[in-house]
């Protein structure tokens, strides 16, 4: 969550029309001031709040994400100036807070390099997915299984996901399935209408806002999933925080999924089989599903 939040705070603040409102946070903005409103961690969280608000992300979603990102500012001691770690000694003059040191390392070693490349958000998203893979491993220790990207892409391909698909994942995790599906849907739209054309951009907007549905119970995983989508230029994806089996019925009847991508949590009863039955029941007639089933 530290890296996720810091990456978001570095992004330029833009509105729903992609008009820049203010610059993203930079290392020199973190001054190690100890007053409560100016602490480095508080500055980072406040910048995240500005970013989410400018993108017109629903308030309830903002609050859920900010509750997770508040870990960055929770410990005031991490905002006190301290001796520099050797990894940032050449990047900072004098002492700096732990939060600033982490921020500075990410800024110089990741953000600036990616920001200089074309397709900034897509590359940032790929890097973020790689970070999640190494940070969370296979997720078994916390009862969460994160599906490798090559598997999510293979399963989306098997289902022949295209620009008109309505794709659902009831155990979203870090949104790996939805990301793979979204990429295929966007590619299909660009092949049909031409890259960067008005028709393609209009269709891509519909794909991102109307054709992807994810549900995730774990608050931190929900935040990671939402951040994953945002870093790909999608702040309006329909990822819901909640219990799959207790979400309103109209969520599924209104969405009308015709593709189900699912890796149910193995720690759930019957190795997650209720997720499979529930997901198949909520699909449109003639829909297709690709599901990973636990082997024990």
What are these regions (language model features)?
Residues 283-289:
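Short glycine-dipeptide loop
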Residues 2-6, 122, 126, 150, ...:
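Amphipathic alpha-helical interaction segments
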Residues 141-262, 267-269, 274, 281, ...:
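Conserved S-adenosyl-L-methionine
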Residues 138:
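Active-site flanking loop/helix segments enriched in acidic
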Residues 2-14, 230:
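Short, hydrophobic/amphipathic alpha-helical patches that form generic packing surfaces
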Residues 119-122, 146, 287:
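Alpha-helix N-cap and coil->helix boundary residues
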């Amino acid at each position: 969550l530290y890296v996720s939040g810091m990456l978001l705070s570095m992004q330029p603040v833009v509105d729903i029309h992609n008009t820049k409102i203010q610059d993203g946070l930079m290392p020199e903005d973190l001054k190690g001031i100890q007053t409560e409103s100016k602490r480095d961690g508080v500055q980072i969280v406040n910048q995240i709040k500005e970013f989410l608000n400018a993108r017109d992300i629903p308030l309830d979603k903002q609050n859920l994400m900010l509750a997770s990102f508040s870990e960055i500012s929770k410990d005031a001691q991490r905002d006190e100036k301290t001796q520099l770690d050797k990894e940032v000694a050449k990047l900072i003059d004098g002492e700096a807070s732990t939060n600033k040191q982490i921020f500075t390392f990410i800024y110089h070693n990741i953000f600036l390099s990616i920001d200089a490349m074309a397709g900034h958000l897509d590359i940032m998203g790929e890097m973020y997915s790689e970070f999640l893979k190494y940070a969370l491993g296979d997720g078994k220790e916390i009862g969460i299984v994160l599906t490798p990207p090559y598997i999510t892409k293979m399963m989306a391909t098997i289902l022949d996901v295209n620009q008109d698909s309505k794709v659902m994942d009831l155990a979203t995790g870090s949104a790996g399935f939805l990301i793979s599906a979204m990429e295929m849907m966007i590619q299909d739209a660009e092949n049909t209408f031409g890259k960067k054309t008005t028709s393609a951009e209009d269709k891509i907007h519909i794909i991102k806002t109307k054709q992807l549905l994810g549900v995730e119970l774990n608050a931190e995983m929900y935040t990671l999933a939402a951040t994953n989508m945002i870093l790909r230029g999608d702040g309006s994806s329909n990822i819901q925080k909640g219990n799959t089996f207790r979400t309103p019925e109209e969520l599924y009847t209104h969405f009308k999924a015709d593709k189900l991508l699912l890796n149910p949590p193995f720690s759930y009863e019957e190795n997650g089989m209720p997720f499979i039955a529930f997901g198949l029941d909520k699909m449109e007639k003639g829909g297709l599903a690709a599901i990973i089933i636990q082997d024990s």
